[in-house]
Amino acid sequence: MDERQTVLPLTVHLLASSGDSLAFQLAVDRLLHRICPDVRLFLVSERAAPIKLYECQTKRPEFPGISVTLFLREDLGEERIDLLQSFFQLPPWTHVIADFQQGRSCPFKLPLCDYYSLDSHMPVWEMRHVHYGTEIVRLTVYCSCDNYEDAVRLYETILQKEATTQKAGFCFFVLYSTTHVSVQLSIKQLHPGISVQVKDACALQFAIHAVGQLVPLLPYPCVPISDARWQTQDYDGNKILLLVVDHTTATQRKAESKAASTLMVIPDNPSLPFTSLNRSMEAKVQNAKDTINPKNISVSSNYLDQSETIYNNTNPSQKLLAPHGIQMKETESNVDTGYTVVSLTSQQAYICELSENQQSAPAFEDIYFSTSQRKSPQNLPFKLEESSSSDVVEGSKALGMTGSMFHSERYQIHNSNISEEEEFFI
């Protein structure tokens, strides 16, 4: 549908036989496009099963339950009216030979009182001339004499607006209106003794916002046929569809839930991206280098890789080396001290923690490898930013051939106030 077209509160669904839906839709659009191009009142679709015909003898005469009347202005040109009239002469339109005037004489010329239809189970169409005013596309729902008052109240309840009464036994609702054209739904009362001929291949679909409060007010049961569509009928048997607008269907909720479950977990502080964290970390390392003049400090920026970081200290004999490609397993905690024991896939590494006096020793970075930090790489730069003064993690390992193990060494650093011993755990 064109985005410029206005959505009406009423849409007429025409159910065509298999293979006829496209031709029917083109025939209707070609006709109405020259009258009201900004709206689409009719939608044609194929019905799943053919209509079952029941032969029964009716004692009372029947009148079509739904009709479409086109009121065209004469002052806009006879050629335009003749063009629209010629469309009814082309297939798939068929001429309906019947007297629908209920005993009244036709006040217009005979061709304008002829009825046309796309199918015998669809509404009938006619054209009439008007001398002034706006042109009208009027969809008329006929009801029996006894059901007229109830039918008016029913459609007022569905449309949530009051009908405009023009004369006794006739009222209408304005669905769309401009200075040139008006689209209306009218309710017309039949004469006593005339029954309604229900059009089984036609359904009136109304857009509503809530169906819960409307269902108890309907004369017949309202059955859900989809997540957002309900079906019922009026007092004369005309099909009514209720489309709940602004409604999130169960399928949409399931799709949204599945999409939400696949989203990545947002870091604790999303306002600090990895690039800004790296810059802040590099600034702190540079300050530490100016203070203690280390020989070399290198920090791996690939947080998504779970390989350990290599640190080089001022003392050449104190180094913590980790070969690239070594993956960390799940960590364990020592039951006596509570410290974390880190295991590697191919070898064992021992992490040493040294503490110095913060008043006498210069500030440096404090990095801990724990279970939560290993699983969340973004915790590493957060730890580097928050540390203002801490101890240097040192360790040593002896490199060997395959099957060799790391050997632990114990380093002890003394200062004037505090002296702590570094512990190694397997």
Swiss-Prot record:
Main location (coarse class): nucleus
Pfam families noted in UniProt: FAM124 (PF15067)
InterPro entries (UniProt xref): FAM124, FAM124_dom
Keyword match Nucleus: yes
Keywords, in A-Z order: Nucleus
UniProt KW Ribosomal protein keyword: no
Domain of life assignment: Eukaryota
Cellular compartments annotated: Nucleus
Gene Ontology cellular component terms for the protein in this record: nucleus
PANTHER family: FAM124 DOMAIN-CONTAINING PROTEIN-RELATED, PROTEIN FAM124B
Family listed: Belongs to the FAM124 family.
Protein name: Protein FAM124B
Species name: Xenopus tropicalis (Western clawed frog)
Gene: fam124b
